[in-house]
Amino acid sequence: MLDLSYYAKTDEIIEHYGPKPASLIPIMQDIQAEYRYLPGELLTYVASKIGVTEAKAYSVATFYENFSFEPKGKYVIKVCDGTACHVRKSMPVKEALMKELGLSNKKHTTDDMLFTVETVSCLGACGLAPTLTVNDEVHPKMTPEKAIDLLNELRGETV
């Protein structure tokens, strides 16, 4: 069960957009931006407040790839595996990140909630391959070594 402050913040977000069905997506976006994921309890709550069925709210949330029902780390690292990045060895970059962070195909977020590593189909920066993003900031021409250096830089920011 979520703390009451989650519901208070959600009420503020709903009030900002107006309690109407057309506000569903921007409300969900703001909730996810606030908590780094979309808590299922809040999605049910939002549905009841704006007049959509719970099924409708969940169908929208699961349709769009950017919504997540699992908490993500402070730094979301997306490793591109599009054709250009793949042939330029993006997967060794991802493997180095996963190994360094103690992650696996089933575990994408570190226990300290600092890092989440995901694979995406294309970041649209093919000329800079292989690329990854950290919180949507593009990092071009990555190597496993550069990726580890980047992790260490990010770790330094959190001290």
Task: Annotate each predicted stretch with a short phrase.
Residues 1-159:
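Signature of N-terminal electron-transfer/Fe-S-associated modules in redox systems
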